[in-house]
Amino acid sequence: MSEITLGKYLFERLSQVNCNTVFGLPGDFNLSLLDKLYEVKGMRWAGNANELNAAYAADGYARIKGMSCIITTFGVGELSALNGIAGSYAEHVGVLHVVGVPSISSQAKQLLLHHTLGNGDFTVFHRMSANISETTAMITDIANAPAEIDRCIRTTYTTQRPVYLGLPANLVDLNVPAKLLETPIDLSLKPNDAEAEAEVVRTVVELIKDAKNPVILADACASRHDVKAETKKLMDLTQFPVYVTPMGKGAIDEQHPRYGGVYVGTLSRPEVKKAVESADLILSIGALLSDFNTGSFSYSYKTKNIVEFHSDHIKIRNATFPGVQMKFALQKLLDAIPEVVKDYKPVAVPARVPITKSTPANTPMKQEWMWNHLGNFLREGDIVIAETGTSAFGINQTTFPTDVYAIVQVLWGSIGFTVGALLGATMAAEELDPKKRVILFIGDGSLQLTVQEISTMIRWGLKPYIFVLNNNGYTIEKLIHGPHAEYNEIQGWDHLALLPTFGARNYETHRVATTGEWEKLTQDKDFQDNSKIRMIEVMLPVFDAPQNLVKQAQLTAATNAKQ
């Protein structure tokens, strides 16, 4: 019988689910495992600068390709990744965290090994990860190891949550039957309970029949749990007005004639706020009702006719249907409503915000102007990444072309996340279409947390756009508290020296301080082509911020001060 090592089995399985790049760092408990990656055609080891950045990169990759894998070493390595893994858990991103752990015999003898706490407890780090993992596995028996690997990959993909997999150093070189690879991992969702699903569909159909002014509200999990196609069909079939939340940016086509804008509670444009809150039926798809996603919980629906479609349950008014998955329920709903909506008379959606006329070329750059004009630079198929802070709020003012995907960590909000996410997303984009552009907007403060990963981009010849918004410090924190506090200040960097410092040869750097310089640069044909890595420093006033961020900061400060 043909056999392969357990380590090679893992990478063959990852290759089969199109997870072709693995992130992480080498450590003595995973070195033998990493040897096996190079035995599998088409697999790539990213080789990150540190484990936290690797976790961020795995998150960015998974958002584009459906799942990812990070490999760390026991203790010191895995713990360094946990902030990033927690963010993936919070934001519904499927990351398989493989940890190389000491051999089974070392654990049994409770040896006082390096990277331990010195107390003989080899399960403590596994237990730490359990609360931010959908499931965990610590392989102890080669006989069931392939099945456990398959289970972990399946769970990562189908639940869109991180999964922890511990692989002892002595097991990865042991053999397992190669024939197991002939049976693909089943990545399909289990069907809904037919009776519960039918009741959901019947109830929603009746609500739609009675509605005169329904709206669709697309949120984060419309993207994360793969119902973008179903959401588009629902838009096309019903012609209901459609809105997105900040976390829902990119979930629908913003060029669709029924698209009405971004709903953020009291932070919404007045006409958007009125349209959503006056609806008599709200079909909410994939909601994550966090503070920054809802304008500090300021939703003010006038109707109680709210249907929440989630990945693992559906809520209709006050009734919850556990275990009913939205993907199948939406498909059944689409089959059931053509007759119901045929006489629906479409309600007008709010008019698009017109882009202001050109300003004098020497006008200093401001956030409001930049975000409103950014759509002119974007093109179909772009991946846009916006860092926590001014970028995460400003991007809500930008109307996207068709098929633009957005990565914004609105819920977890770990500053510096997007540098690693840019690496992962760019590697994923390169595997899908080398011409696909990946564009990052990040503040000067956030960049300082994770800047090392730019060197990994250069190492792999990646060609992203990195827009550094230089407003001299942590602007979002200044707006919330301590506008002149020393702790919100940073050391200024020579940003345009970073690419050559990290060893770049084929690169461009630009500094933009006026609207004329912005327009000249972004309209340049060569600049529009992702032929090289680029860093663009955008010079902005110290306290300049999108108006929504100013308002959100006031709400957050008030929340923090409540007794």
Curated annotation (Swiss-Prot):
Record-level GO BP terms: aromatic amino acid family catabolic process to alcohol via Ehrlich pathway; branched-chain amino acid catabolic process; glycolytic fermentation to ethanol; L-phenylalanine catabolic process; L-tryptophan catabolic process
Listed CDD domains: TPP_PDC_IPDC (cd02005), TPP_PYR_PDC_IPDC_like (cd07038)
Residue sites binding pyruvate 1 per the record: D28, H115, E477
Regulation: Allosterically activated by its substrate, pyruvate.
UniProt cofactor(s): Mg(2+); thiamine diphosphate
Annotated binding of pyruvate 2, by residue: Y157, R224
Residue ranges that the Swiss-Prot or TrEMBL entry lists as coiled coil: none
One GO cellular component term noted in the UniProt record for this chain: cytosol
InterPro entries xref list: DHS-like_NAD/FAD-binding_dom, PDC/IPDC-like, THDP-binding, Thiamin_PyroP_enz_cen_dom, Thiamin_PyroP_enz_TPP-bd_dom, TPP-bd_CS, TPP_enzyme_TPP-bd, TPP_PDC_IPDC
The entry's keywords: Allosteric enzyme, Branched-chain amino acid catabolism, Cytoplasm, Decarboxylase, Lyase, Magnesium, Metal-binding, Nucleus, Phenylalanine catabolism, Thiamine pyrophosphate, Tryptophan catabolism
Record's note on what induces expression: Protein expression is strongly induced by high concentrations of fermentable carbon sources, under anaerobic growth conditions, and by thiamine limitation, but is repressed by the presence of PDC1 (independent of its catalytic activity) and thiamine.
Protein name stated in the entry: Pyruvate decarboxylase isozyme 2
Gene giving rise to this polypeptide: PDC5
